[in-house]
Every structure is written in C-alpha cells, then in structure tokens.
Amino acid sequence: MQPPRILFIPEVREDGTSDRSPAVLRLLRKRHEVITFPSPRDRLIYDTSRARAPRYALYAVDRLLAAVQGVRLGRKTHIELTFCETPHHALVGLWISRILGVPSVWDSHGNAAVAARSTGKGRVYTFLASALDRFLGRRVDALITVSKADAEAYEAMGVPPDRLHVIPTSVNVEEVEREAGQAVPRGTEAAKTLIFFGSYKYTPNLEALRFISARLAPYLEKEGIVCQILVAGRDLPRMDLHPSIQPVGFVEDIHALIRSADLCVVPIWSGVGILTKVVDTMATGTPLVMSRPATMGIPEIQDGVHALVATSPDRFPELVADALRNPEKMHEIAGNARRLVEARYDWRIQEPLLEDLLTKLTTGAGGSRHRGG
C-alpha cells in the first residue's frame, strides 16, 4: 500500500535545525510525498509593528483565500491528508479536509490557554485563542501535542481523549553527534564560555536575553567569574547588552556551537510545550542550567540529576556560578541528560508513533471522519 500523500500547512524553511516544524516535515518526507502549502501573507498578518485593524481584515481574507487555493491544490495533487502546524493554519486545513473528504491532523506546539496565562495575555486574547483551540480540537481527526501536560489541558477544554496523541519534540541524536563532531569547550580555566540561543521574535526568549544582560552577567562579574556569553539565533534585537555578551546571530551548525560551550543557560520564565533548545543541549552533552518553567513538557528532568533547575530568577545566577565552579559535577549531570534524550526524546523513537497515527487515519482505523463537536 502506498503511503498517503500529505498537504503540509504552512510551508516552512527546511534549514536543518531541530525546530519542531522543519523536523516533522523532514520525518514526513522520508516516507511520504509531501506537498507544502505556502502562506506568504503571514509575514504581514503577524507583524505587530503594523496597525491592528488592517492586519485583522487581512487575516480574515487570507484564511478564505488560503482555503480556496488549498482545495484547488489538494484536488490537483490528490492529497489524502492535511497536516497543519499552527491553529491558524489548522483552521484552513480543516476546511480543506472537510471539502475534500480527507483526514485532518493538527500538530499543536502548545495549549493556547496555558500559553496565554503563562505569558500574561489579556482576557480577550485568552478567550479568543482558547476558543479557537477548543473549536479545532473537537473537529480535527487528530490533535498531536508535545507533552502529556498539553494533552491534559486540551482534554480539560473538552477535546475527546481519543483524538489526542502525545509526540514530544525530539532530536535526531545521530545527526546531533555528526554535526557536533569533536567540538570541545572553547573556555579556559580563566574564562568560561556560556551560550543562550533561540528566535528572539518569541517573547520569552527576548525576555531571557534581557535577564541575562541585566541580572546574570552582572552577578557573575560581581562574583569575579570571567566569562563570555554567546547569544545565537534569528532576529536578534538592537539593544544595549552587558560587555560579556557576544551576539553571534544565526548559526547553521548550532550543535557544534552548543558543544563548544562550557554551559548552556535557559532562563525562560513563561511559555508552553517543550523547548527545543533544552533537548538540543541535552543531546550534545553540554551542561545546562535552566528555570523551572523551561522543564515543562519534560517531566523526567530532575534538579541535580539532569540539570540545575532554578525555582526563581534570584536563584538562577547563583546556580550558574555553582555550575561554573563545579565542572566535574556538571559533566556527570550532562551525561545523565544525554542518556535521557537517547532513551525518550530521539525522533527514531517518536517516528513510528507518527507513522502509526497517519496509517490509522488514512485507512479508516482511526475512527470516523468529520465528527462534529
């Protein structure tokens, strides 16, 4: 039997990173013919520097146009399933699936209600985002979540449990090892190297960068700890940073850069789902100091076993200083973290779960299609 032909929404940049959307797309391409559906107007719609009313109007028009174009493309290419990466694109995918009579899959990166509360969004935003999540969750044929906690949050919204499937954000450990190669920490006894990385359009990452500059770096300086803090990733803002911080921008071989650091820091205090940067760092075997919220989605992480975990912003700089002063202890902790990723968060473990789900949906074994809710 031929594997199902998939319409993947939206088209994403396949840049070799461990980010969930391109990673999932690469997995799907291994066994399926995948047609990607571009969403060129997203750049304007989600540009918060632009006026709100025109963006909202464009959003409504764009969803309608995308649905029409998607149906045409789906008919032309004979798709057998839609696979969508955000709630806004899942809305389009659901319409396409209903019209063409094919199953719809939504790969949720985090529950909207939990995310809104975590990031301090207003009541109106929280209500609308939660309503869209609930609407989609009750109507798509399968809702993939990145963690059990997210699945439970959707179930509390009224999403039927049989539509929920937990497939954690993972990494390809073999690829990580190949990319990281023989990189060794570039720091010395006199000056250590720290790293933080991510996309700075994501508000929690931007807040983390400010925290590193305003609180972590000055604390280490006061303690007499000499270090350089590498800051990598897309969309680095123009802002005054502590002199010990060295912006390096987007790095293609990020795993080699992570392994070359003595310590990775993740002071994320809001957000949902599994942070790719955490799994990436654990896979490289680089020691990690992280905030308690950054452990969300990876319940196996234990403080002092897989990482040093700060329960408050005040505690975070203290743990970083402790980690830098105890490299042998951190080396052991990093080894535990890598073994956890190898056992639970390698895509080779998750890929069969994804394939099994798609097979059941397209052969009718996954339940009746187009159920209302």
Where are these regions (language model features)?
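Short hydrophobic beta-strand element within catalytic cores of glycosyltransferases
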Residues: 277, 287-292
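Membrane-proximal helix-turn-helix segments that form the acceptor-binding/catalytic region
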Residues: 64, 68-75, 91, 95-99, ...
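A short, well-ordered alpha-helix in the C-terminal region of glycosyltransferases
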Residues: 329-344, 350-353
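Carbohydrate-associated surface elements
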Residues: 149, 167-170
